[in-house]
């Protein structure tokens, strides 16, 4: 159960990083 929780947290962090990177590139292009 803990492994699935850590996988979910890792996925959410990765998605947040991708979103921030896209917004940063759009604002600074």
Swiss-Prot record:
The chain crosses the membrane at residues 5-25. One of its GO terms (cellular component) is plasma membrane. The keyword Lyase does not apply. Induction: Expressed during stationary phase (at protein level). InterPro entries: YldA-like. Its main location: membrane. The lineage of its organism: Bacteria, Pseudomonadati, Pseudomonadota, Gammaproteobacteria, Enterobacterales. NCBIfam families: membrane_YldA. It comes from Escherichia coli (strain K12). This is Protein YldA. The gene is yldA. It comes from the Bacteria. It is found in: Cell inner membrane. Keywords: Cell inner membrane, Cell membrane, Membrane, Transmembrane, Transmembrane helix.
